[in-house]
Amino acid sequence: MNSLPAQLFVDGTFRDASTRARATLINPATEEVFTEVAAASPADAHAAVESAQRAWEGGWRNLAPGKRAEILFSIARILREHLEELAQLECANIGKPISDARDEIGLGARVFEYYAGAIGKFCGQTIPVARGGLDFTLREPMGVIAAIVPWNFPFPIACWKAAPALAAGNCVVLKPASLSPLTALRLGELAHAAGLPPGVLQVLPGPGSAIGDALVTHPLVRKVSFTGSTEIGQHIMELAARDLKRVSLELGGKSPNIVFADADWQRAADTSPMSVFANTGQDCCARSRVFVERGIYEAFVEKFVAATRKLIVGDPTQEATQLGPLVSASQRASVEDFLDDARKQGTKFACGGNRFGVPPSGGRDAEPPEGGTPNKGFYLEPAVLLDVDKSTRCWREEIFGPVVCIVPFDDEAQMLRDVNVSPYGLSGSIWTNNISRALRVARAVQSGVLSINSHSSVHVEAPFGGYKQSGLGRDLGMAAMEGYSELKNIYVAE
């Protein structure tokens, strides 16, 4: 792979960090140094915000909607032209299976297309008021948006935040996770090549705490859009409250997967493993708590475990691979801590939970070549835990790894209490062929995104976000664009 992005992207050009600091990136599939990238400082963050403010005042905020749409459509086209390059970059950077990486780059391009088309439909309204006259509303851009994105879906989430913010007439300072900055840097470069003016989209790789705090507290930043852990989201809210800065937060999850006996439970059992193990479980929407009606529990578990054992875990560069490594050694260690606690509690493991390595170009069961090096990579077998005590950490806390807990239920009302006792409320699935039950349970589950007889969580056209400690505000759909605008009311007397 040639010419990896290695610097900050500010004012339409790459430049070194002011301190010349650099960070090392590790390929999680090989445990080898992949590349180095510049690490921004708070001073770099301040400079990027001030540059973005100048770009906003200098013309982006007032650019004709049709011209803004033209640029966003152009960004979508250039992203599709570079899809394979970006997918390979993501695969090497975070161990994302190459087929998933391609899908995610395509999703990012689709997001830009959607918001390019939305620009001409984003407007206020006229309002009849009691005293007569003319009353109407305007949707106006906010200014500089700080977008802080995670390492698990770095490219699509960067697009989820940048595209609607740009479409609404804002400028964006994008802070990718320190583990996964490369596709974000290319996004900035390609967007500029597609016609986005200098300073409208800045990209700052670097340490999350220092750069994030600098962005959140900068007086010119009008809104912070963050996806990541609940703990960091709480910290951002505290900082933003000092000057009443707007925030939107997409945080943790402990999503339920509810399977009733009248459902097509065989299909649910076949498809449910990937609803929790996809992306090696590093997904805030992972259906990590499975509730199965007791009459089908044993048969469901048998089929679920069989489907789990068939998953292809291995080298993410291979087309057939479904699950790659965890993103880092520390992330694997964190997941293993949960599994160790479960073992100490006497939890039953139906399968998985062990560490293994994968030789280059090999699969899960491949042997290293004769005389070769030991297997490498931050791999962990998908773990299926049964009859889990609801007081354990594995049941209560977000693991962010390939671990699922399955329990039986007898009573719908008690099951719903167990579902909703979680402090999280992001996503979930309900499996039943009874439409009345499906709608009743969907209304009762305290989650922002639910699917019935499906595991789908994300649609570009629909709002995405959670209840409770899973966050506030919404990504995607027209709701996201509204969240990047100010609503102004104007009254004209007769």
Label each region the model flagged.
Residues 1-29, 55:
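Hydrophobic face of amphipathic alpha-helices that form TPR/SEL1-like repeat modules
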Residues 31, 68, 90, 112, ...:
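Residue-level signal for inorganic ion chemistry
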Residues 123-267, 409:
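Rossmann-like NAD(P) dinucleotide-binding subdomain of oxidoreductase/dehydrogenase enzymes
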